[in-house]
Amino acid sequence: AEYNKHKNDKGYVNEAISKDLVFDSSIVTKDTKIDKITGGKFIKASDFNKVNQGQSKDIFTKLSKDMNGKATGNFQGSKVSAVEFGPKGGYAVLLEKNKPVNVTYTGLNASYLNRKITKAEFIYELQSAPSQSGTLNAVFSNDPIITAFVGTKNANGKDVNVRLTIKLYDANGKEVLPEKDHAFAYALSSLNSSLGTNYSVEHAEFVSDFG
């Protein structure tokens, strides 16, 4: 009914797409977690949470600093908490240009054409960042639907550009790939922008180059 109401609206597809891939909030179980993170440098929780006197302690302030490539934490020592990261928190990691970071989730209850998906890999590769050091701070949530928050200190106005590759696996460890007539359908949310005269800093978030 909702599709029929909007099918002629701009931004909607002309024909309804079946939901063959189930990967939404319903797939999160009590066992869902980040099993491991490889390829990146862990930021100590104490370093991530550090703010200057008088600064806000919100996550966006904590993300908006340049670590200058210095991150000497470990997996467990990088765990941070905030309501935005979900009830199980997340892990603070430093991304460096052209160095992929692999975040592996286990304990999933997802599916594709009734084939159970229990594991997912989210591979992030930084392409550019506006910090002086060229690095980007990230917090990867233990909830794969919340996914990640990123930020750094803006020194030169460059775009934040991150390439994301997602791989899904069944209970036997075999990668799940889309079939020709049953494409994966993506719904993207929390893409924010601040454009116009009411904002001191203009920015827009978008996704491009699917494939």
Could you describe each region identified by the protein language model?
Residues 189:
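Structured beta-strand/turn binding interfaces of compact recognition modules in eukaryotic regulators
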Residues 182-183:
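Loop/turn elements at helix/coil->beta-strand transitions in domains of secreted/extracellular proteins
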